[in-house]
UniProtKB/Swiss-Prot annotation:
Segments crossing the lipid bilayer: 6-26
Organism of this sequence: Trieres chinensis
Record-linked HAMAP family: PSII_PsbI
Cell compartment(s), UniProt: Plastid, Chloroplast thylakoid membrane
UniProt name for this protein: Photosystem II reaction center protein I
Function of the molecule: One of the components of the core complex of photosystem II (PSII), required for its stability and/or assembly. PSII is a light-driven water:plastoquinone oxidoreductase that uses light energy to abstract electrons from H(2)O, generating O(2) and a proton gradient subsequently used for ATP formation. It consists of a core antenna complex that captures photons, and an electron transfer chain that converts photonic excitation into a charge separation.
Length: 38
């Protein structure tokens, strides 16, 4: 059960960090006129 929980937590953290990284890296290129948010 502990191994399953660790696997789930690792997958969740991986996808969350991937989503945050993708959002931060694509946000300025998608909205070049909103650099004041940075």
């Amino acid at each position: 059960m502990l191994t399953l929980k660790i696997l789930v937590y690792t997958t969740v953290i991986f996808f969350v960090s991937l989503f945050i990284f993708g959002f931060l890296s694509s946000d300025p290129s998608r909205n070049p006129n909103r650099k004041d948010l940075e």
